[in-house]
């Protein structure tokens, strides 16, 4: 019986089974530049995506490039990637192709980012702090792979690893949500925490390295 229980626990770990945590009112803090600090977000369902919506909030005072959200599969880097190259310059990747959205550089911190993409038209729509930054064409007809490693805090240069400290995120991230469909972004509430793939109020995650959970400072 003891061997059976151990076997079941081992299979649960292999399958990525993690207890759900209600993160409402909390944030992940990445206190310093690092190549080892990150959080893996485990979706409720692993599936290929022909549409998706991603929303999250973040605070940082970095002036160098950094990753906000990194979604890789074993066969493709940058399946979904949110990356800031310069202040106010948001690089949004789907299937390792990129669209660049530019915002005013004097925006107040923190920022609320919402972006959606649909395969049939290839249209990516980007909103920042409740205001649209426009729509651009990106990888029309593509399907995002479903067997993914989803990481905040680092940019994956290989599946689940090969991190560069000079691209790491330093600051705070909270209210991350991912949906498997296009959500009209003008209707996404300020809380933006109820995605059907990643839900901040029922979050499956694994933290690694120097990551701290604290009550959030901002709404």
Curated annotation (Swiss-Prot):
Where does the source fall among the domains of life? Eukaryota
Alphabetical list of SUPFAM superfamilies matching this protein: Concanavalin A-like lectins/glucanases
Supply one GO CC term from the record: extracellular region
| UniProt keywords, alphabetically | Calcium, Disulfide bond, Glycoprotein, Metal-binding, Secreted, Signal
Record: glycosylation sites: 51
- Its main localization is secreted
Instruction: Specify the signal sequence span.
Output: 1-19
Its tissue distribution reads: Expressed in colon.
| Residues holding Ca(2+) 1 | 77-78, 155-157
Q: Where are the transmembrane segments?
A: none
Q: List the disulfide bonds.
A: 55-114
Q: What SMART domains does UniProt report for this protein, alphabetically? A: PTX
Keyword Coiled coil, does the record have it? no
> Which molecular function GO terms apply here?
metal ion binding
Instruction: Copy out the cofactor comment.
Output: Binds 2 calcium ions per subunit.
Ligand binding (Ca(2+) 2): 155, 157, 167
Q: Where can this protein be found?
A: Secreted
Q: Which family does it belong to?
A: Belongs to the pentraxin family.
Name of this protein:
Mucosal pentraxin
Q: Tell me what gene encodes this.
A: Mptx1
């Amino acid at each position: 019986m003891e061997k059976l229980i151990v076997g079941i626990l081992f299979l649960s770990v292999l399958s990525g089974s993690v207890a759900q945590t209600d993160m409402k009112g909390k944030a992940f803090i990445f206190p310093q530049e690092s190549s080892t600090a990150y959080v893996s977000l485990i979706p409720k369902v692993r599936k290929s995506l022909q549409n998706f919506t991603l929303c999250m909030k973040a605070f940082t005072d970095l002036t160098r490039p950094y990753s906000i959200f990194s979604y890789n599969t074993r066969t493709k880097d940058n399946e979904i990637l949110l990356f800031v190259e310069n202040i106010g310059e948001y690089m949004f990747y789907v299937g390792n192709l990129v669209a660049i959205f530019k915002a005013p550089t004097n925006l107040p911190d923190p920022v609320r980012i919402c972006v959606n993409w649909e395969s049939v038209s290839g249209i990516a729509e980007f909103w920042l702090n409740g205001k649209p930054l426009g729509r651009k064409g990106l990888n029309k007809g593509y399907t995002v792979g479903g067997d993914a490693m989803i990481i905040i805090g680092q940019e994956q240069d290989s599946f689940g690893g090969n991190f560069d400290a000079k691209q790491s995120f330093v600051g705070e991230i909270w209210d991350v949500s991912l949906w498997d469909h296009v959500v009209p972004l003008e209707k996404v509430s300020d809380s933006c925490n109820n995605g059907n793939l990643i839900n901040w109020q029922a979050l499956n995650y694994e933290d690694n390295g120097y990551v701290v959970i604290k009550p959030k400072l901002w709404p």
